[in-house]
Amino acid sequence: MSMSDPIADMLTRIRNAQAVEKASVVMPSSKLKVAIAKVLKDEGYIDDFAVTEQGGKASLTIGLKYYAGRPVIERLERVSKPGLRVYKGRNEIPQVMNGLGVAIISTPQGLMTDRRARATGVGGEVICYVA
């Protein structure tokens, strides 16, 4: 059975794994999921990620990060969904928690944070909010 929203599935797997304090979470891999994991690692929300191939299927393993026994990611919310895409121009890019959080945006230059998109002067599809 095909999945209608693999990005929402990825975010839900991360939320569920952190709720039970797992050290890592494994999911099917795709280029977009790897790009999201790279942004999360660059921003310090996850420890590490790795793509492994087994039996012709690629898997993405994400190492979760905790601080003082609590998950580093407090909020992980999907914004643009398959049924309702959310696009923002370069002057409309949202701030998450007044700049404390990050919005991950898909732009013509690739996936990037809201701060980088504002600095570059590009808009795009708002994938998710992370705080």
UniProtKB/Swiss-Prot annotation:
One of its GO terms (biological process) is translation. GO terms for molecular function: rRNA binding; structural constituent of ribosome. It comes from the Bacteria. It holds the Pfam family Ribosomal_S8. Gene3D superfamilies: 3.30.1370.30, 3.30.1490.10. One of its GO terms (cellular component) is ribosome. Keywords: Ribonucleoprotein, Ribosomal protein, RNA-binding, rRNA-binding. One of the primary rRNA binding proteins, it binds directly to 16S rRNA central domain where it helps coordinate assembly of the platform of the 30S subunit. Belongs to the universal ribosomal protein uS8 family. Part of the 30S ribosomal subunit. Contacts proteins S5 and S12. HAMAP family: Ribosomal_uS8_B (MF_01302_B). This is Small ribosomal subunit protein uS8. It comes from Ralstonia nicotianae (strain ATCC BAA-1114 / GMI1000) (Ralstonia solanacearum).
